[in-house]
Design a protein with these regions (language model features):
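An extended, acidic, His-containing surface patch that forms the Zn2+-binding/catalytic region
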Residues: 197-407
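Short glycine/serine- and small hydrophobic-enriched flexible loop segments
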Residues: 9-17, 114-121, 394-398
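Midchain, well-structured core segments that form catalytic/ion-binding scaffolds
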Residues: 53-253
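Short glycine/proline-enriched loop/turn "hinge" motifs that connect secondary-structure elements
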Residues: 19-21, 79-85, 149-155, 261-264, ...
Length: 407
């Protein structure tokens, strides 16, 4: 948000102009593309680790100043965590048949729709933590992959949806998505066999099964010519990306190419991940940091109280936020399933979890009151923008050790 950029630039200017200085150093970082793919923040991880090593820095706190929304004029909101985001991508492979004989094949759309109906808004894929609940999952895309019309059933179909999470791990979410998807296919296949029986059709098509993207890759790796295929596939993905193809489309295309290379004609569904991935993060759950989030909450509440304001602490910012890339709640190995399941080459979408773990800086969102965010009438409260928030940030810089030191 432009207000956040201007507000923090003003704080930087005022702090830098004071020759006496405060108790901590201030690094201003301006990055673009938040709420889409966070290219700026992901790209800045290398800079942050380089500066850390060059100047022996200890990052103690990161502050984003995105506006908050509230119906209470005397209330300020502090977010001490941010929701995580996964984007599962589902590619279904059917068995071709003529449209006039649908029970001699399996329509990939039938498989995809069965899974989509099962997963959409499923409560098992929401999450709860610290009294807050993440939104239910919702599909963004669902369609066949035919390039033109013909009279055959659909061989490939694909879709993707968003899963917003708080404490559940990517592995837990992937496992539950896998289980629910297989349940959906089992239910579909029972109905399908019953229809075949009614039509006097033989049961010659195998029961559809769900596999993970990682399993698909492992099966393909065992085949002759895989390395050459993989190199060509990655090059095509890079070229398509430069030509404007979305990450989600790249992931779908990559899975379809792997299925074609595998050559298994049985019906199946592949589940992987498409970018972007945002780890969930809450300052209460961070290890290996020198910062006490409770001290900040207390300090900010006391500051606001002297000005006649109340403080509302929200454990998670429920919109996508760059603070996801400031620290990890768990060890890097806990997130490996994401990297293994991303159906896009690292040259196209890079996420360096090791660097996030290296900077490991607690992050909060502390910004001005705003209204109609992301709309034409978007605006922020002038007093917050010019006085309340910047004045507190400056006080924090000058008295950080006195107020928030954990030693």
């Amino acid at each position: 948000m432009k207000a956040a950029l201007a507000l923090q630039l003003g704080v930087l200017e005022a702090y830098a102009a004071d020759p006496s200085g405060g108790q901590v150093n201030l690094l201003y970082l301006s990055v673009g593309d938040e709420e889409s793919y966070s290219r700026g923040m992901r790209g800045a991880l290398g800079l942050l680790t380089d500066l850390q090593e060059k100047f022996d820095l200890n990052y103690v706190l990161a502050v984003d100043s995105e506006p908050f929304e509230s119906e209470v004029g005397k209330e300020k909101v502090l977010h001490i965590g941010t929701v995580g985001k996964l984007m599962p991508v589902v590619v279904a492979q059917g068995v071709l048949s003529h449209m006039k004989e649908p029970l001699k094949g399996i329509n990939a759309l039938s498989l995809l729709v069965a899974i989509a109906s099962q997963l959409d808004l499923h409560p098992d894929l929401a999450d709860q933590a610290l009294g807050e609940t993440s939104p239910l999952p919702s599909w963004s895309y669902l369609r066949d992959l035919k390039e033109q019309y013909d009279v055959s059933t659909v061989l490939y179909a694909a879709g993707y949806f968003s899963v917003l999470h708080l404490k559940k791990t990517p592995q837990e979410l992937l496992q539950r998505i896998y289980e629910l998807s297989q349940e959906a296919l089992d239910t579909f296949y029972k109905k399908y066999e019953h229809l075949q029986d009614q039509a006097g059709q033989e049961h010659v098509i195998a029961k559809p099964r769900v596999i993970t993207y990682q399993e698909l890759e492992e099966r393909c790796q065992a085949l002759e010519g895989y390395e050459a295929f993989r190199e060509a596939s990655n090059k095509k993905a890079e070229q398509d990306f430069r030509n404007g193809t979305s990450y989600q489309s790249l992931a779908i295309q990559q899975i379809q190419r792997l299925l074609e290379f595998l050559g298994d004609k049985d019906p199946m569904v592949v589940i992987g991940f498409a970018p972007p991935y945002y780890p969930s993060m809450n300052c209460r759950f961070l290890d290996n940091t020198d910062f006490n989030i409770v001290s900040l909450i207390t300090d900010y509440r006391e500051y606001l109280d002297t000005r006649g304001y109340l403080l509302k602490v929200e454990e998670y910012f429920m919109g996508i936020n760059d603070t996801s890339y400031c620290a990890l709640e768990k060890d890097v190995a806990s997130y490996q399933v994401v990297l293994d399941s991303l159906a896009t080459p690292a040259q196209v979408y890079d996420l360096d979890l090791e660097k996030i773990a290296q900077i490991q800086v607690p992050a909060v969102n502390l910004g001005p009151w705003g209204k109609e965010l992301h709309k034409r009438g978007e605006r922020v409260y002038k007093e917050d923008f010019l006085e309340t928030i910047p004045n507190y940030l400056l006080e924090l810089l000058y008295h950080f050790d006195d107020r928030l030191s954990t030693e």
